[in-house]
Amino acid sequence: MSAYIQFFIRYNDSFMPIGIYVRSSHIYQYFDEYTPWEKIKVVTRPLLDKIRDDVNDDILYFQKRYDRAKEMKEYVVTMNNSMDEKMEWIENIEATLGDCCEEIEKAEYVKHYLSFLDDIIESVEYEDNIDHKNYLYVGIEVGNPTVNDIVR
């Protein structure tokens, strides 16, 4: 069974979904450790900053891995092995390069989504009522949340 992470905007006491992502998505993977199950919690700038740091760390990791694979590919060409062995090495390295590019692209997508959420937070006009100050929420397997589902 696949779990879903959902994002909501609060309007009075109702919650309008603005995004839903399956467990295999990068959005889910980055938000998972910070998100309650069957409850919702407010999405704050500090939370987005933590996740952005995680994403940037992953991008840096995959960029370094990509650079190392490129260096290895250049080295393999100069090795004294058979052509078949070289080609096998190069094919494996090419797969690694492709995987790194794919992971970087997915992480960049998450960064864009974080910017989208930042824009929502920035554009809201806060009211004096504390219940309406926190208007962007996230939860896993929450269905149709109510104010009783909010984790404070």
Locate predicted features.
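Acidic (Asp/Glu-rich) sequence patches and key acidic residues
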Residues: 1-152
